[in-house]
Curated annotation (Swiss-Prot):
Any single GO BP term: tRNA wobble guanine modification
SUPFAM superfamilies xrefs: QueA-like
Primary location class: cytoplasm
Record's subcellular location: Cytoplasm
Protein name in the entry: S-adenosylmethionine:tRNA ribosyltransferase-isomerase
Pfam (any one): Queuosine_synth
Stored HAMAP family: QueA (MF_00113)
Keywords: Cytoplasm, Queuosine biosynthesis, S-adenosyl-L-methionine, Transferase
Amino acid sequence: MLTLSDFDFDLPPELIAQVALPERSASRLLEVDNPAGATGPARLIDRRFAELPDCIAAGDLLVFNDTKVLKARFLGQKASGGKIEVLVERLTGERTALAQIRASKSPQPGTTIRLADAFDVTVGERVEPFYTLHFPADCLTLIEQFGRLPLPPYIEHDPDATDETRYQTVFAQNPGAVAAPTAGLHFDEALLARLDAAGVERATLTLHVGAGTFQPVRVENLAEHKMHSEWYHLPQSLADKIAATRARGNRVIAVGTTSMRALEAAARDAEAAGRPLAAASTETDIFITPGYRFRVVDRLVTNFHLPKSTLLMLVSAFAGVETIREAYRHAIEARYRFFSYGDAMLLTRRDA
């Protein structure tokens, strides 16, 4: 049985990308091509991300996550003067949100907090591990006006104007995430136009990425890990496109692990209910580890993930544990850039 330690690796810190490249599609792409029938080692092909249209057949379907990152981080003060840090996790109403609060002493329900030295919020009930916050006006408006972009903890600079553009995808539509669906960051309008011209199909879903995506796994036995929950919406038009893609013998390609999780969660639930894949708007805490049976996704575009992370487990389940180990060894030797602002992989499913 695989344990947490099986997903550890040593990463030279200088390979953690701290800034985005000047051009989105200028990043590198490691194609990991598993052979049909799951026999033999995968081929590792070093490419540029701009070559992606050459790797995808006409009629294949790319599925993107169109979530938009909120300016969800605030510095603030309690009425006592104590400093706090707030990270809005999700919007729950026009004037309410769930948030993480870091403070020397936990705030009590009914107390007020001053955020960004601009407005007060009232602390409501505790919804572990979050607090309910009541805003004095429309949450989204105040967050966008006074909040700060929540860059990942391994990016060591304060967010600037470049980050406000480059830590969003060009197709971001629906505000609600506190982390970017980073595989989508490599796509610019010119590359999307080339994919369209090559006959590649496109569709979107929405999964609002939560801060839990950065939470470490703290148990050696993976069965004991409690996965964070995230909200997603899969439209009927996407379900129909997937059925049509399957019918003509083409492949479904998830852009990012967030798209993958939404697709596989919806398909698993549909299968359990004895019905075909259809529209869904719900929460998922799907935890994909080796041994999982994939129902929808044939290929995956994804960045390089943190050691011992649930996302490293997901890609290992998809492409094979040894395949991912070998691919990561190659990427480190070849000086690929890692994590959110880093380079990408194109994975073929091990059993596909």
